[in-house]
Amino acid sequence: GKPSPQGSGNGWSGWYKEWYFRSLRELSYMINVINKNSLDWKPGEGSVRIKYTFFDGTERNYSPDFIIGNKMIEIKPKKLQATPLVQLKAKAASEYCLNNQMEFELIDPQILTDDEIFELYSKKEIKFLDRYEKKFLERYNKP
């Protein structure tokens, strides 16, 4: 993989039920939108690979975060949505969607509160990868 842009990813990865999440935003979207509305979905990775041409002319692949019905969903904070790389991928995804009767959405979901995260963790509904587990326990100062 390539290095992420400055400020991307808020440092939390793990599992919610059997679903892998790569950020608090993805986790929040899984819980507040997908789970709450019982939506049928699949991860974009492994389902869709969209070719795009990088700034240096090399061809790369992009996979969205979620596929929900005919919608392709990418989760990004507002502050990163206008960055050149996100725009490049969004353009490729939009063209792909146009040719495949799909819609592309770039979404910045409302993030779960600290209390909601801690409750999910306490009920063992979420499990962080080891390095994030340590960070989580330090942040919440819980044994």
Language model feature labels by segment:
Residues G1-P143:
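Electrostatic, structured charged patches in enzyme active sites and in nucleic-acid/phosphate-binding
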